[in-house]
């Protein structure tokens, strides 16, 4: 997902837990699966293959978890009146915020308009009726970017694994997305620090 992650959990002795190394191995495996499915920073991931290697009107088979996240993205697009749109990838990349090379100069109005023509939740179809879900573009150049919710999905995956082990005190963070339960080592609620943004004169936000 092109970001960092941190996991803390407390072994309170109430249940027999696997060794820390085994827990780490399982957590890494779960994250790898999410990356293999939904990371635009990984060239061979499912989402990268869909973005770069499929033509318009060509169904592309995806995993159930990938489909679940896309389905949620479609729902969120509706309830936010389009504020959350996972098809903004072409614009994200144009401005240098995606896995593509960084921005060297401000894009022209023509470039922005061209990329914007590829954006829209109505420009792809998710079909979950078959044995395996499929995604189909209606326009060549459509680029899905699930970074707005895929990290949260990954956080939930890791938290669910910890709870399956019987761990009731944990804090999971992936790229700023958090899920916590219980208390820290001092038996106090987890405290989350939020960095105050600063802006140097002459910089743009």
Model-based region annotation:
Residues 1-205:
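Mature catalytic core of soluble alpha/beta enzymes
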